[in-house]
Amino acid sequence: MAQSEYLFTSESVSEGHPDKVCDRISDAIVDAFLAEDPHSRVALETMATTNFVVLAGEVRGPDSLTHDRLKEIAREAIKDIGYEQRGFHWKDAEIVSHVHSQSADIAVGVDAAGNKDEGAGDQGIMFGYACTETEELMPAPIALSHAILKSLAEFRHGGDTSFGPDSKSQVTLRYVDGKPVGAASVVVSTQHAGNLSQDEVRELVRPHVLKVLPEGWMCPEEEFYVNPTGRFVIGGPDGDCGLTGRKIIVDTYGGAAPHGGGAFSGKDPTKVDRSAAYAARYLAKNVVAAGLAEKCVIQVSYAIGVSKPLSVYVNTQGTGQVDEQRLAVVLQQLMDLSPRGIRQHLQLSRPIYARTAAYGHFGRKPEKDGGFSWERTDLVAGLKTAFGA
């Protein structure tokens, strides 16, 4: 039986969080390869700690992207985020590259040849989700958590020196009859200038929270937590070691939907961990946008070297207006879910990934250059026609 009233929480982390610094660097390198050769293969991991960055992974692409060029790309990403502190500075951080060529065994099993279609780059399961809680058809807790941190980042990039790049947010919403009605608590931890007190930071953060929450949704004052430890001056990779791919729930639905376990950043779009998760979101969003359900979970699965998905599962969580099995069939008629089909349909072989590395891969606006193409709702007409809606 569904609960009539409950609390649900999601968190976000900023572009300056140590793990997000690594995601940004990894995706900037993916973009660099795709910009020169859209057929590049990239699996790039980054580690960042006190003034030290390690690049590692496997690539196949243009020779112009040397180790020195990869280091430059990493440095540019750190600069763009805004790190100019003693323990982590874009100018003098030591950056080493241990990137090497992709395994020939993987290439043979995955690449298309002759009459053989391109196979998936690995086995795995991927999920997509959409719901009617926000205009972006995203769960409200993660959408609001992202929005708070984006507001802080815009303030900082505008020239204010009160905040540092590293911050986190967490929003707990109260639900009644399955709908969010207000915030029960809000937590914001943000790196700040050393001369600011906790109370001063609290009042600087407050307007960014109020701007984001719908009117009347602000939590009780005693449930509004800003820097609960009292001080947050040392931040970023100088405070905690960062790694690519460690914020997969922040990147997706904030825990409101299942996750297959595969991270996105650092992977070119032939990797189904990334491309199939984007496709699953695209399909789920179109189902909800078409009015066929208020909630939609889609799971797809793949095997390495096999071009078609092994399974496609649709669950509208009791909100559907149509048969779920038929919906799964129709979705596969509207979109080729082979790795190549996904990449072509969503035009993913473009340098569009660095921008995804912070504030969520989903719930963003489609961009003219093809960025966030998986947020389009151009299947709505086809779905309505198929179901006579």
Curated annotation (Swiss-Prot):
This is S-adenosylmethionine synthase 2. Keywords: ATP-binding, Cytoplasm, Magnesium, Metal-binding, Nucleotide-binding, One-carbon metabolism, Potassium, Transferase. It is found in: Cytoplasm. ATP binds at H17, D166, S167, K168, R231, F232, D240, R246, K247, A263, K267. Gene3D superfamilies: 3.30.300.10. Its EC number is 2.5.1.6. InterPro entries: ADOMET_SYNTHASE_CS (IPR022631), S-AdoMet_synt_C (IPR022630), S-AdoMet_synt_central (IPR022629), S-AdoMet_synt_N (IPR022628), S-AdoMet_synthetase (IPR002133), S-AdoMet_synthetase_sfam (IPR022636). Binds 2 divalent ions per subunit. Binds 1 potassium ion per subunit. Mg(2+) binds at D19. It comes from Rhodospirillum rubrum (strain ATCC 11170 / ATH 1.1.1 / DSM 467 / LMG 4362 / NCIMB 8255 / S1). Homotetramer; dimer of dimers. Its cofactor is Mg(2+); K(+).
